[in-house]
Structures are given as structure tokens and as C-alpha cells.
Regions:
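Acidic/histidine-enriched, glycine/proline-rich intrinsically disordered or flexible terminal extensions
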Residues: 135-142
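Acetyl-CoA-dependent GNAT
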Residues: 3-61, 72, 132-134
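Conserved catalytic-core motifs of GNAT/GCN5-like acyltransferases
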Residues: 41, 88-91, 108-125, 134-135
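Conserved active-site tyrosine of GNAT-family acetyltransferases
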Residues: 2, 102, 107, 129
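A beta-strand edge to alpha-helix "cap/lid" segment located at domain peripheries
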Residues: 72, 82-90, 94, 113
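Short hydrophobic/aromatic beta-strand or adjacent loop that forms the aromatic wall/cage
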Residues: 22, 124-128
């Protein structure tokens, strides 16, 4: 059964992001968190050091206000500034709004994992979208 995180759990997660140096952008409307975006390591192996997996979340009360796009633009600029080569988005196949935003921002479809997750009493397919950048001028060998 899917369990929502408590405020304390989410705050600890935010703190861990800060401690690890991973970017975390929060969209605030009148003191209320309307959304956030972050990225972290795609895989915990040196060969993948230039690839990140991102997350973007917008509260349902703030859908269709352009918040996800604004947050994603911030993440993309941060990734470029940090020599990221590839940014990966892993999206529930049924989340067409997120897929459309990613496509609008230049992400391209790169694959599907069927039945990758189980949530809300059903199996979910996961689609991968990626955006490639120049990356580092002199990448380090793993």
C-alpha cells in the first residue's frame, strides 16, 4: 500500500539533498510549497558520473500554472553548469502531462520498463526520457 511521507520525512529528505550538494529548487507561492525539482546520481558507479536522474513535483492545487516548466528550466541550467552530459526523467507512462512537458523541453523518449513499480493497487510502466548536453570538456575516465 502506498504511504505518503510525513512532513518530517520530507524535511529530512530536503536536508539530505542539501548535505549531499544535490540541487533542490522549491517553488513557493505565498509561503506554501507549490512544487520542487531536484536531481541526483543516475547510478552509484563512476562510469555514470555525468548522468543524473531528476524529479519534479507540483502539488495538484497548482497544476497548469507553468510551475513544472520553470522548475525544469532551473534544473537544466544547473545541470549544464555542473558538466552533466545526460539528464534522465523516469515517468509513469500514464502521466501524459509530465511527458508533454519533457518533450516540450527537448527530452526524447529512450525506453519503457513494463511493470516497473507497484502503487495504488496496480502495476506501473515506467518510461524514460533523456536530454543530452555537451558535458565536460575533458571527462574523467571511471
Amino acid at each position: 500500500m502506498y504511504k505518503e511521507q510525513t512532513l518530517e520525512e520530507r524535511l529530512r529528505w530536503f536536508e539530505q539533498k542539501q548535505i549531499s550538494g544535490e540541487p533542490l529548487f522549491v517553488f513557493d507561492i505565498n509561503g506554501e510549497v507549490a512544487g520542487y525539482a531536484t536531481y541526483g546520481s543516475f547510478r552509484a558507479y563512476p562510469a555514470y558520473q555525468y548522468t543524473v536522474e531528476h524529479s519534479v513535483y507540483v502539488h495538484k492545487n497548482h497544476y497548469k500554472k507553468g510551475i513544472a516548466s520553470k522548475l525544469m528550466h532551473s534544473l537544466i541550467e544547473e545541470a549544464k553548469a555542473n558538466d552533466v552530459k545526460t539528464m534522465i526523467g523516469c515517468i509513469d507512462k500514464e502521466n501524459t502531462a509530465s511527458i508533454k512537458i519533457h518533450e516540450k523541453l527537448g527530452f526524447t523518449y529512450s525506453g519503457t520498463i513494463r511493470n516497473a513499480g507497484y502503487k495504488f493497487g496496480r502495476w506501473l510502466d515506467l518510461v524514460f526520457y533523456q536530454l543530452d548536453f555537451e558535458g565536460p570538456e575533458n571527462p574523467l575516465e571511471s
